[in-house]
Amino acid sequence: MKNVRHWGWVAFWTGTICSLLSVGCRKESDRPTWDVDLLVPLVRTSFTIRDLVADSLVTTDPQGTVTLLYRSDLFKLELDTLLLAPDTSFTYRYALPIADSLNFPAGFNFFSQNDVQRFDLEELALRTLVLREGRLELRMDNRVNSLVIGTLDLPGAIFPNGGTSMTTSVGAGTPSNPTYSTAVRDLAGTSFDLRGPQFNAVNTLETSIGAMLDPAGQGAWVTADDSLVLSANYLGLVPQYARGYFGQRTVEAGPDTNDLSLFDALVSGTLDLDVATLRLTVENGFGLDLQVRMRQLSAINTRTGNTVDLTHTIFQGPININRAIDLGSGFIPSQYSNTIDVSNSNIDLFLENLPDQIGYELDLGLNPLGDISSGNDFLYYESELKAGLELEVPLRLITNELTLQTVSTPDLPRNAEGHALRSGELKLFATNGFPMSARFELDLIDANGEMIATIPVDGIAAAGLLGANNLVTARTESVLTAELSEELVNILYAGARLRSSVAFTTSDQSQHLRILDSYRMDLQITLAANYMVNGDE
């Protein structure tokens, strides 16, 4: 966010000092040295509310009042939640039914079987299935002393080329030395009618399997020890479209959490909001009715360990979600929304907890009224059920020590043994047009985030002056100072990082103050430093 860049100037004071005061080349060790006092302007910058929060979150009304608008997904359920087509194999065996041998002529169709294959899809009762991905493997295990041609015909299926069958062959084999072959068919785009041969079943595919001796061969003597095994293997099936009855069951979502980045830069302090709105939206891309029972929606602040549960009538009863509309080549999802605000909930307390996570738990009832579509539930590969949150927070607020924090590593010239900066005083000239005072802190921390030392900052940036309408009518000027001792400079050069914090407090703690897009703070930073000339050896 932009605030990292602007408040980063504060964090980089010391690094910038050293950069500006560094002299070019290393001096000879016998050169004379002397110290001088220098006054150097370092930084001049300005920032608005768009530099304190991500610009993409900021909207304004015609009066310039700032509103934060944050959108986030709460949860999402996709196709594999409702339909998972497992790998499935069907095996067919032929053996001579008598303890004798028979001489079959070339081209003889010695094995033929009509069958219905039933797929195990648990609660789902599908009538139509169109595949996006998948393959069909026809495997043959031959112990007959002739090349054998095997055929798998699927009257209930239509391949993309319009065909319904696949054929493969396997070389001659014997009981002691069988031969094998595998043919593979890409099933992408294949449509299956799963109503069976009488069109009154579900999850059922009509199948015909056959095998004949090579028409160009010599025929074969077949004994009771000879056999042929054919297997049809459906692998890696991913539906593009499915229609049927998807069952009546409950799917649990959560308990789980999602990250919330709205308050990422805030580490402490309190926030009191005048108004806030949360819009809960649900989009159903599945062709079945849903009933949602919200169990919990929580604002979790992992920094403080505090959790605030949202209270609203939405938790008292089910939410009924209509099914999507099937267009034949796509779908129109159904939409649901509910507006939660300070008049019907504790949304203000929910957000004032400054959450960095949202916790949720809910139950999804599929087809709560049963098969009211008469087996016409549907889904597409692109179907999903998703719930989202839209937070709208007009910046009419009271803050007390609401603290932004950044950590940075200064890019210092030279090294701990070869720098010439001895000490200095930083001055920050602030012209503040916000209705909030700003208190600055600078800490030196180690690689683990533990504080080593503090750079003391004296003074605060006073809040702008309020008029009768509680808007800033005049900006105020303040001067802050920070002493950089020789010890602090040495700590910086020893590898410490800078943690800068800015704590904002509204000037009126009894009324919610509006933040306008036009409010601005101007900053100028100067350095009065003691520098050892020829001392950077």
Region annotations inferred by a language model:
Residues 25-537:
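Extracellular/secretory-pathway and virion-surface proteins
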